[in-house]
Amino acid sequence: MATDTIAGDRIRALAGRGPPGIAVCVAGPEGVRAAGADGLADIAAGVQASPWMVCPWLSVTKLVTATAAMRLAELGVLDLDAPVFEHVPALRQVRPAARAGRITARHLLSHSAGFSNPMPVRWVHLEDQLAPGPDLFLNGLLARHHRLRFEPGSRAAYSNLGPLVLAAAMTTVTGRPFAELVSEEILGPLGMGTTAFTYTPEMRRRAAVGYHPRLSPMRLLLPRWVIGKPAGPWISLRPFLLDGPAYGGLLGSLDDLARFLLLHLRDGELDGVRILSRAATASMRQITVRGRRYDLGLGWFRPASQRDADPPFVEHLGGGVGFYNLIRIYPSRGVGVAVMGNATSYHIDAVARLALAD
């Protein structure tokens, strides 16, 4: 099916006073139905935004982590319902110890393990800075945030710690570094050639600049070495990488995110490559545990405020300093939408809804 272009003026109308640059696509099982972009990927250089610009995916990465975990489960390598304690030495610091010993991969996938959610705004480094190793990073985090808030499985509470623990378990059971595992099991087979945990030369050429409101108080929390030059009402950000890949470290294009969206719209198969069974793909969208802010499935979530949405949807957001992204599926309609923008915050829900309404 031919892909329609979403006109730039329509995208700008959708975004309102949105990010400097934005890219949107709408897809169904047959493929991408429409895609487009508007604005600037780099204000200073005058580079136009496009579906091929590369942005940090931030927490949209969690859905890729979840998909990789489900694949390992189907391969018989990862037991979703067995405690992960023996696979993750850092969990020995967590209290109460009895609760920590009951945490399973299923709990980690559904954000129902009981972890708190510390602010990750400083969990970043520049490309030329030395990053902490995954074990050292996780050990340090759990030493500081070691108390579980509730019994695993009793409710959901979104946390950036869970995916890091899950990645550690995945590394142990496979004997493969997490980034390598995701590349070989998900990104490579799906042909997502401009998505990775570090910039390739081609990705660097396509990289969008992130922007944060110049007068925002949150600017005071940012590491000084991330802050770039002013650009009108914005402050630019220097290209950064995340210390914990599994919770938000992927970098990639909307074009590649559309391929990942199609994988889930096509029940786990894309271009003749099956990553997950139909049953496993559907189970990821099934809401199993409720929380105050989000209700969770095995990767996908639904805002608690949207429990009665018609039509119902599941999604994952990727928000952080400088970028804001979304991937959403309406299962009953068999359609999905993906949005990427290079600003900390904008009306992304309105963009997604109006893009689908077109």
Question: What is each residue range found by the language model?
Answer:
Residues A2-W57, V77, R144-H146:
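Short, conserved catalytic-motif segment at the N-terminal edge
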Residues V32, P96-G319:
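Short, surface-exposed loop or secondary-structure junction motifs
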Residues A45-V47, N325-L326, H347-R353:
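A short, polar/proline- and glycine-enriched secondary-structure boundary/capping micro-motif
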Residues L40-D42, P83-R92, R122-E127:
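Short linear capping/connector segments at secondary-structure termini
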Residues S305, P311, V339-D358:
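Short, gly/Ser/Thr-rich active-site loops of penicillin-recognizing serine hydrolases
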Residues G36, E315-H316, Y324-A343:
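Short, well-ordered beta-strand elements
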Residues I6-I11, V24, E30, V54-D81, ...:
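Active-site SXXK
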Residues D79-P96, G188-L190:
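Short, glycine/proline-biased beta-turn/loop segments that scaffold the active-site neighborhood
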